[in-house]
Design a protein with these regions (language model features):
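Glycine-rich loops and low-complexity Gly/Arg-rich segments
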Residues: 19-24, 106-109, 139-143
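Short, low-complexity, polar/charged sequence segments that are solvent-exposed and flexible
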Residues: 14-17, 99-103, 134-137
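Catalytic active-site module of serine/aspartate enzymes centered on a nucleophile-bearing elbow/loop
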Residues: 125, 129-177
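A catalytic-pocket lid/entrance helix-loop region that shapes and gates access to the active site
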Residues: 1-42
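Short, solvent-exposed loop/turn and secondary-structure capping segments
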Residues: 7-11, 93-95, 127-128
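Serine-hydrolase catalytic core
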Residues: 30, 35-124, 164, 172
Length: 177
């Protein structure tokens, strides 16, 4: 903990590195301690255990994403499975999936792309079997940390079942090649 918060952004540094070198990144709109306060406010406002999507939106407003900060998905070899839900309150996962799809339309690539964007599913868009393995006594508990998961439990479960069906189909096809 730092000043009562459990999470804060790095100070002018990337959160991710590759081969020991920091990767380009989108700077957060807020610094510590405002970052933690904004997350708490957003979580409370939406009745979610944790939420930060508005912080990411604000970050992109203050610092439009630059080419060097984008993931070069066109360099990925093999099958790329992109999954997101519109009701993700941690970040705009559906927007990012669409952004990657658009990027692949304009850049030559060899990867096979399977993209799935669901209306409901929350941040935890995992295959249903994986959720049952992680939480055998109540897989639905995972999505209920978010207001959308509590409001749309049936739809979230249907999303997880569909993800399982699609990922299984893709893996079986890949194994048969």
């Amino acid at each position: 903990k730092r000043d009562g918060v459990t999470e804060w952004p790095g100070e002018g540094e990337s959160s991710v590195s590759y081969h020991g070198k920091p990767l380009p990144y989108l700077p957060y709109a807020y610094r510590h301690p405002e970052y933690g306060r904004k997350m708490q406010e957003e979580s409370k406002e939406g009745k979610d255990i944790v939420a930060s999507v508005n912080m990411f939106r604000e970050s992109e407003k203050k610092h439009p994403v630059q080419e060097e900060e984008l993931i070069k998905v066109e360099n990925i070899k093999g099958t790329l499975i992109l999954v997101a839900a519109e009701d993700d309150v941690l970040w705009e996962a559906a927007k990012y999936v669409r952004r990657m799809e658009e990027r692949l339309k304009i850049h030559p690539h060899e990867c096979k792309v399977e993209a799935f964007v669901y209306k409901h599913g929350t941040h935890f868009v995992f295959p249903e079997g994986m959720v049952k393995t992680m939480l055998p006594i109540g897989g639905d508990l995972m999505t209920r940390v978010f207001a959308a998961g509590r409001k749309y439990p049936r739809e979230c479960k249907e999303t997880r079942i569909d993800i399982e069906r699609n990922v299984t189909r893709i893996i079986k096809k890949w194994m048969a090649e």
